From Swiss-Prot:
The lineage of its organism: Eukaryota, Metazoa, Ecdysozoa, Arthropoda, Chelicerata. This is U30-theraphotoxin-Cg1b. Residues 25-45 are annotated as: Disordered. It is found in: Secreted. Disulfide bonds join 55-69, 62-75, 66-112, 68-88. Residues 1-17 form the signal peptide. Probable ion channel inhibitor. Expressed by the venom gland.
Amino acid sequence: MKLCVLTIATLLVTATSLETQKEIAEGNELTREETPSLVEHKEDEAAAASEKRSCIEEWKTCENSCECCGSSTICSSTWAEGKEIKLCKNEGGTFKKVLHFIQKGISKLKSCKEGN
């Protein structure tokens, strides 16, 4: 009798563990299916970072144009290396305008002192 109960208990444990393994395997399949979308998401992030770098590089060459980052956006003017350039406003243009205003003020003070 004890042997019979032990055999039945072993069969139940085995059947349960097989079901658990099947659920785990199905979960792994779902994970594998999600992986391509995760890869696409990472590729999107890399493309966005590349576009942002491109825009920053473009600030230097974006003279007299409000087309930064490949699309027409609101720009602000600023000065860099002695010449006026346009910056994408959403990429920190306001900060650079304030910085330019301070630099321009200091430059005027220096030229006044040198002139007198």
